[in-house]
Amino acid sequence: MGFFSFVQEIAMDLGTANTIIISDDKIVVDEPSVVALDRHTDKMIAVGSKAKMMYEKTHDNIRTVRPLRDGVIADFSACEQMMRGLIKMVHRGSRLFSPSLRMVIGVPSGSTEVELRAVRDSAEHADGRDVYLIFEPMAAAIGIGIDVEAPEGNMIVDIGGGSTEIAVISLGGIVSNNSIRTAGDDLTADIQEYMSRQHNVKVSERMAERIKIAVGSALTDLGDEAPYDYIVHGPNRITALPMEVPVCYQEIAHCLDKTVAKIENAVLSALENTPPELYADIVKNGIWLAGGGALLRGLDRRLEEKINIPFHIAEDPLHSVAKGAGIALKNVDRFTFLMR
C-alpha cells in the first residue's frame, strides 16, 4: 500500500459482540463492538477493548453502547462512530490523510431492506466509497474454504453474538436459510439469570461471559475434555455481602439447554426446507459450524447426536466471516452474490 494510495480495501465482519477488519489479507482489527460516548456531547471517548473495559463501570457523564443488537444496528449514530474509530485503527499513523474505502461487510442473512440500508449508510458515513454487502453464512463458507460456486449443497451454521445464521449454499447462492435471533448473548444472559436464581449471586454481563468461556458446555458429560470448576466472586443478591461460588460445567450445560435446543430446532427447520439432492450432499459433506458459538464445548457432538449428520467446527470459527469477506473483496467482479 503506497503512501499516496487514495483507495484502501477493507473487509469487515460487523458483529454484535466483536468487529473484525481485514486489510491486505491480514486481520488488522479484532475488537469488541463497544463504544464509549460523552453523554452531553455524544462525542466518542473510546472504542473497542478500551470501551469494553469501561462497560458497566461508567459514571453519569459517560455511556457505553453496544450499537448492534441481534446482529443488526440498534443505534445508528453510535455504530457510525464505532466504525469510524475502528477504521482509524487500520491506517494508524501511516498517512497524512484518510483514503476513501472500498468495503465488503458481512450482514445477517435474515436482514430486512431497512437493516441492510442502515449498514450501508453507516459505512458510507465512515468514508466508505464503494460498499458491498455479503450475507454472513456465504462469507463464512468462503472463509472456511468451501467452493460456494460448485453445484453442490453445503450447510453453514454461523453462531454469532446476536444471531444464528443457518444457510444451505449451492451455485453461488443461498438456497434455503434460517436466521434466528438466538445466539451467544442469550447464552450469557442464561448464565446471569441462573447465577442469580440458583446461587443468589449477582454477576455482571462480563462475568457471565467469563463463566461461559471457562465452563460453558452443551453437554453434561464431556469426558476427558471437562474443564476445571470456575470460582465466581460477587455480591449476595439479598445481603450484598461478598460471595465465592464454585461453578461446574454440568450445571452450566443444564442452564444453557433451552437456548441450545432453539439452535438445534433452527438447524432442523432449515434442513426440512432443503431440496432432496442438496440434502444428500449435506449428509455426505457434513455441516460446518462457524462464529464464536461454535467454540461452546460439546456443541458439535450434541448437534451430531440429535441430527445424525456429521458436524465440523471451522478451523478459525471466530474469523471465518471476516476471512470470507476478505476473499470476496478480491473477487468483487466475479462474485455475483455481493450486494451493492
Q: Which role fits each region the language model picked out?
A:
Residues 1-159, 167-287, 294-340:
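Nucleotide/phosphate-binding catalytic cleft detector across ATP-hydrolyzing
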